[in-house]
Amino acid sequence: MPAKFVRTLVATLLFAAIAVPAHAQWKPTKPITIIVPWAAGGSTDQVTRVTAAEIEKALGQKVIIVNQPGASGSIGTKNALEAPKDGYTWTAGAAQDLGTYAVLGMLDTKIGDWALFLNVANVSTLSVNPATPYKSATELVDAMKAKPGAISVATAGVNSSGHSAMEAIAKATGVKYKHVTYDGGNPAVVATVAGETEATSQLTVEQAEMIRGKKLRPLAVIGDKPVELDGFGMIEPLTKWLPTFKAPANYFGIFVPKGVPPEVIATLEKIWANEIAKSTALKQYATSRGAQFAPYAGADAQKAVFPAVQANAWSAADTGKAKVAPDTLGIPRP
């Protein structure tokens, strides 16, 4: 084969490889729906609305938030999963839930069935109604030990962030508590403020305004790092009293089911790198609410969320709540 022909062929192939993009830019022609599977006003609803506004600007298309609470988030998530795979229906929430719905027998899906676009990492705070006598995490834990199953704790339901956090405390201390569930973090927090329950273990972002207004007394961040809450001050971590306590970060974000056109995912990944990662609005949200700004996508997002998936799944298994063994779903014990 003549050398000149070979050089021409190679040059042509190289040009073709460079000229053809991996995926075309997605330009939506109608509004996008994000199903928030929790009640309005909760942590998922709050941060999703901030994120949706940034996506609207980047895409030049309306993003509609639809709240569909119920069954610990599985109803709205199922509706997003079963929607047409045209890229116009997403969901949002805590990424750990996607990895544990199947463990709990609530929904046949795994974390790998979704493209993850994270915005913040949240931690829970153990707080009480100010009318209760508890002034520290130790006092509340001691009371739970003295009165097993009597002290009520409000959460957004089984498998919610607040429930997972409280189960981690129960596992570490051996306490039993009365679990009272609500359709979302905000209703759970309001219930504790109203005196329907004595305590809540919901996310700090959901409690922030009530803590600032002295309508809730925060006892400890359910983690190993303190939280500096604007307008209040420092909330000490639970590890101050329980040094060996562990609770992985709980990442929140927007989730797109696999099977949508690849250009949808590629466009969102570009938006996350160029817009969301630089979002002043999201950074301010995180700072004011005691959250961590965490704009991860792709493989980085999957890697970040897996420790929480493991912890949540095996907590369910160890407490007898799991319907399916986590290791059969590709979730090894941490």
Task: State what each model feature region is.
Residues 308-321:
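Amphipathic terminal alpha-helices
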Residues 41, 95, 129-134, 156-160, ...:
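Short coil/turn segments
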Residues 18-24:
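Sec/Tat signal peptide C-region and signal peptidase I cleavage site
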Residues 26-29, 55-57, 79-89, 101-187, ...:
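Hinge/capping helix and adjacent helix->loop/strand transition within the periplasmic-binding protein
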Residues 207-279, 324-334:
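C-terminal lobe and pocket-closing loops
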Residues 24-111, 150, 158, 173-206, ...:
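N-terminal (or domain-start) structured segment
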Residues 1-10:
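Bacterial N-terminal signal peptides that target proteins for export
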Residues 277, 281-305:
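Mature extracytoplasmic/periplasmic domains
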